[in-house]
Structures are given as structure tokens and as C-alpha cells.
């Protein structure tokens, strides 16, 4: 009887440990960061309003699942297909935004300087500006990666470039997510 009781207790303990593990795993999956836009879907067409052929304003973006312990967020939008998607030679940076307060959940359309939360810093893009520069592909359909990072620190940089920010982020990324949109000149 003692053997059966011991086996029963061990089984119960195993079930409890298994259930606890499932709760931890399920909780982690539920907390994954996600980035979305009401203007376009993942791998979808970016409306011309947000490009050089339209108003050239930043699209609305919303995110969730920023991990506890995050001290800042970084948003980078770039195009890995420049200048020609059949023979890409460079990654073109369209927008760099960092030191976004972690409680921030979204950017409105045309966030610009006035629509960004206090403390947020705009970095230098490849247009040599500290503002959003929309898609304007010279050849073919390009992909535009909207990458959001949660960091365990803030970045001590003034109008940093993408490469400076990526170096400063090393070892500080808690989580990241991305949203990809596409655009080709003439699309509406």
C-alpha cells in the first residue's frame, strides 16, 4: 500500500509540474509581440497614400505584447530590395524611431514629430532626414519591413542612423516583431 501511495503522490506531483509547464508555455506564447497596421495586412499592398506617389505620411501602426521589463521600443522601416528586387544592392532605410516609451501601444497615421510620444527620438534615414520617407521604389515591387524591438534600456544617441542604433541595441533586445508590406510605383 505504501508503494501505491508513493506512486500516486509522484504521479500527482508530475501532473502538477506538467500543468505548471503548460501554463508557463501558454503564457509565453500569449505574450509574443505583434505589430499590425489597419492600412495593410502582413505581406499586403501598402496604399499609395503612405508613399512618394501619395501624401508620403507614415502609416498607422499598433502593437501588443511588449514584455515586462522593457525600457524602450525601437521602430525601423527599411527596404531590402533597393534598387531592383531582382538584383538588390542595398537596404534602404525609410524611418528610424527609438526611445519610444514602452507603454506606447500605437502610432497614428502621419505620426511625424508632433504625433510621437514625449522622449521619442527620430533617427536619420537614407533620405538624410529625421522623418518618415515613404516607399518610392525605382524598379519593380519592393518589400518594406516594419521592425519593432523591445529593449531593456534606452539608447543614448542623438539622431542615430540605423547601423548605430543596431549596434547600440546589441545585447538589449528582449523581443521583436515585424510587419511586411509591399509597393510598386503605379499601385493605388
Predicted feature residues:
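Bacterial N-terminal signal peptides that target proteins for export
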Residues: 3-18
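Domain-scale selection of a single, long terminal region
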Residues: 2, 28-29
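N-terminus-centered regions that define maturation/targeting leaders and the start
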Residues: 30-188
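Bacterial N-terminal signal peptides
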Residues: 16-27
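Intrinsically disordered, low-complexity regions enriched for glutamine and histidine
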Residues: 1, 6-7, 92, 140
